[in-house]
From Swiss-Prot:
A GO cellular-component term linked to this record: membrane
Location(s) in or outside the cell: Membrane
Classification via PANTHER family: SUPPRESSION OF TUMORIGENICITY 7 (PTHR12745), SUPPRESSOR OF TUMORIGENICITY 7 PROTEIN (PTHR12745:SF10)
Glycan attachment points: N47
Topology within the bilayer: Multi-pass membrane protein
Major localization listed first in the record, in broad terms: membrane
A Pfam family it matches: ST7
Keyword Transmembrane belongs to the record: yes
Protein name: Suppressor of tumorigenicity 7 protein
Transmembrane intervals: 15-35, 62-82, 512-532
Length: 585
């Protein structure tokens, strides 16, 4: 019964929409017929005569005031429309007309079957948009104490936003904690420390966690049998406490490396112990997963310390060993650290081998992958590339491959070329990036600009070809060429990730809609006419009459501004300027 009633209501609604769409002319004539029949009871003739009498008694000042008021209201609407467009990227009037008025006027098709058939496609597109707007951990992130804090001490600016640091706190809680931490006092303290917002409170908690292990060893060793002293001495210190101190308290990379080496000793012992017990239950399995994340993080940061201190070959070896030992942990994106270190060594063959493994269609792309591939292609032809010669003879096969690789990279992240070509100033990269966004472009260019400068002619080739990408994708938000359409959410997320003193790069550039430009011009022109008419009523009347005469005369082809002003002078009978009189001294 309920289904029948619902079907009847839907059918009635569709009939009403159909009648409104196609029979509005009939309704209009019916209204006119009713008005004609009721003209005597409604006293339409008397009302019309009263209205005409009222209009005849109006003075020109009323029309000037009316025009000025309408211009003021239009200007306010224009200002509101411009503000709404700057904030939300769309026209308010257009959005209201499309979202609310169009359904009322029958502009929405009632095709529930099509909607149900396309539900799978919509879910796929939604899933893609979610993955495109996902915030990723920056694999090349800097050290807070040794790099970010030193920048703050020198410039007085905060390079990290609260949103970025909050995401890092969530990552630390995910990687470095587990459900069994409350059983160990040091881990319980560190579990609270990762949630602490104040940096000094986090550092104090890390020191407290290390002191608890010291006190426990001093108190328990004399009280137990000698057979268990060996086990107590093997109890590791808190590895995560050393990680926090290395990240936030160490003021130099060398100090951070020392603390990470101490963390490695503690973390390696915990990892080996939990590896033996991981099959004893879900609790031990979660603990082993946590210890694995801690160990991988420590080794990766040690490799980054070696890279910062100039020991690049040692860093490459550590990264390769880490990728062989833990091949399934792709969340840290260690291959991007490896690519940057290999480029520093100018080991381009090894870089190509890494790209062959990770530049796969089934794997997520990044600016590092796409632009490194473009750099290798450009390196083969950039030293001999000349725009003038290419325009005369055309592009060779190698040059075409390099240009296509650059177009592919620019389509993935269009913000990078401005930083590589130094058209925009660089800032310290954030701890998290958004794929295809301005934050990823900053993180890539911050470390790879030197590699592009080292390849002769690479930046020249990029400068000559990167803008050609936009001709291939005229509507990047709707359809891409090699990748999915450019996500709309990048600007909003980048503004949260990047500091306020940085001007976020926006792609594509938001152009003002024609409605706003037309309204602005119309309001300005109307306001100017109203002001001139109020100040010079006679002159403007003659000017309007002269314009009408010119437009409707046979001399329309030969009119010019001089003829207009001659007509105005004739109508006003402006006397000639008086001659200067000379009086005798």
């Amino acid at each position: 019964m309920a289904e029948a009633a619902t079907g009847f209501l839907e059918q009635l609604k569709s009939c009403i929409v159909w009648s409104w769409t196609y029979l509005w002319t009939v309704w209009f004539f019916i209204v006119l017929f009713l008005v004609y029949i009721l003209r005597v009871p409604l006293k339409i003739n008397d009302n019309l005569s009263t209205v005409s009498m009222f209009l005849n008694t109006l003075t020109p000042k009323f029309y000037v005031a009316l025009t000025g008021t309408s211009s003021l209201i239009s200007g306010l609407i224009l200002i509101f429309e411009w503000w709404y467009f700057r904030k939300y990227g769309t026209s308010f009037i257009e959005q209201v007309s499309v979202s609310h008025l169009r359904p009322l006027l029958g502009g929405v098709d009632n095709n529930s079957s099509n909607n149900s058939n396309s539900s799978n496609g919509d879910s796929d597109s939604n899933r893609q948009s979610v993955s495109e707007c996902k915030v990723w951990r920056n694999p090349l992130n800097l050290f807070r104490g040794a790099e970010y804090n030193r920048y703050t001490w020198v410039t007085g600016r905060e390079p990290l936003t609260y949103y970025d640091m909050n995401l890092s706190a969530q990552d630390h809680q995910t990687f470095f904690t587990c459900d069994s931490d409350h059983l160990r006092p040091a881990d319980a303290i560190m579990q609270k420390a990762w949630r602490e917002r104040n940096p000094q409170a986090r550092i104090s908690a890390a020191h407290e966690a290390l002191e608890i292990n010291e006190i426990r060893s001093r108190v328990e060793v004399p009280l137990i049998a000698s057979s268990t002293i060996w086990e107590i001495k093997l109890l590791p210190k808190c590895a995560t406490a050393y990680i926090l101190l290395a990240e936030e308290e160490a003021t130099t990379i060398a100090e951070a490396e020392k603390l990470f080496k101490q963390a490695l000793k503690a973390g390696d012992g915990c990892y080996r112990r939990s590896q033996q017990l991981q099959h004893h239950g879900s609790q031990y399995e979660a603990q082993h997963r946590r210890d694995t994340n801690v160990l991988v993080y420590i080794k990766r940061r040690l490799a980054m310390c070696a890279r910062r201190l100039g020991r690049t070959r040692e860093a490459v070896k550590m990264m390769r060993d880490l990728m062989k030992e833990f091949p399934l942990l792709s969340m840290f994106n260690i291959h991007e650290n490896l690519l940057e270190a290999l480029l520093e060594l100018q080991a381009y063959a090894d870089v190509q081998a890494v790209l062959a493994k990770y530049d796969d269609i089934s794997l997520p792309k990044s600016a590092t992958i796409c632009y490194t591939a473009a750099l290798l292609k450009a390196r083969a032809v950039s030293d001999k590339f000349s725009p003038e010669a290419a325009s005369r003879r055309g592009l060779s096969t190698a040059e075409m491959n390099a240009v296509e690789a650059i177009h592919r990279a620019v389509e993935f992240n269009p913000h990078v070329p401005k930083y590589l070509l130094e058209m925009k100033s660089l800032i310290l990269p954030p701890e998290h990036i958004l794929k295809r966004g301005d934050s990823e472009a900053i993180a890539y260019a911050f470390f790879h600009l030197a590699h592009w400068k080292r390849v002769e002619g690479a930046l020249n080739l990029l400068h000559c070809t990167w803008e050609g990408t936009f001709r291939m994708i005229p509507y990047p938000l709707e359809k891409g060429h090699l990748f999915y359409p450019y996500p709309i959410c990048t600007e909003t997320a980048d503004r949260e990730l990047l500091p306020s003193f940085h001007e976020v790069s926006v792609y594509p550039k938001k152009e003002l809609p024609f409605f706003i430009l037309f309204t602005a011009g119309l309001c300005s022109f109307t306001a100017m006419l109203a002001l001139l008419t109020h100040q010079f009523p006679e002159l403007m009347g003659v000017f309007a009459k002269a314009m009408i005469d010119i437009f409707y005369s046979t001399e329309l082809r030969d009119w010019n501004c001089k003829s207009i002003f001659m007509r105005i002078e004739d109508e006003l009978e402006i006397p000639p300027a008086p001659q200067s009189q000379h009086f005798p001294n």
